[in-house]
Amino acid sequence: MNKKIPVFAIAALAGAISQTAMAEAPSFNYVQFDYVVSGDSEVSEGGLSESFDLEQGFGLQGGFEIGDYVMVMGRHLSLDYEDDLGFALGDTDNAVFNDMTFIGVGAHIPVADMIDLYGAVGFSRPTFIGIAGEGYGLEVGARANFEMVTASLWYNMADTDTKIGADSLDIDPELLGLDVAISFAPDAPELVLGYVDATHELEIDNDKLDLDYDHFSIGVRKSF
């Protein structure tokens, strides 16, 4: 065995560790815009289902730190789907099924030099075909910074309702997302690749409807 190989391997590992050690803690002061490039949605009720392709969509999110650990954060999703069958809006050929807005206050805690866990509670407003529920929301996640790449894994859920005549409609969304932000130069905006897998569960009286959807996005993030 060539003795130089272990030496080079150890040197490479030490270099990687030193580069990782120099990485800064992830920032929670940022704004981000996402353009949703592809996705679909499936509406299911009583064993029947209908699928819809995404026509267009965008997302906004951001955060602002107050002190060392407390933060305010928010996110918004707006998604339009092809609706040639007129499932939602009659004569129009697109439908807004599952927009979502969340604004919360929380905190982040470092668990390693480059990794923070965070959580926030606040106001959530999901929609279904123009009907908006309002209630409380919760988001938890982890964010890790590795030199030129910042990865964020997050889970958002809510318990909301609204009135339709004398009936109460519950809209309970759950979203699981992954964002990977790539920095090409110091202090420059970052390229963000994102994926979201989600569901909206709707219930009115004894009737239930499930709305499952996922999408891929590309965006721009500016951290401060």
Would you name each region that the model predicts?
Residues 38-45, 77-88, 122-130, 156-167, ...:
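Sequence/structural signature of outer-membrane beta-barrel proteins
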Residues 52-58, 97-103, 123-125, 132-138, ...:
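Residues that define the transmembrane beta-barrel architecture of outer-membrane proteins
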Residues 19-82, 101, 215:
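Short glycine/proline- and aromatic-enriched beta-strand/turn motifs that initiate or cap beta-hairpins
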Residues 1-28, 224:
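Cleavable N-terminal export/targeting peptides
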Residues 68-74, 112-117, 144-153, 185-193:
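Repeated loop/turn-to-beta-strand initiation elements of outer-membrane beta-barrel proteins
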Residues 180-186, 212-224:
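Outer-membrane beta-barrel "beta-signal"
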Residues 29-36, 63, 73-77, 118-122, ...:
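Transmembrane beta-strands of outer-membrane beta-barrel proteins
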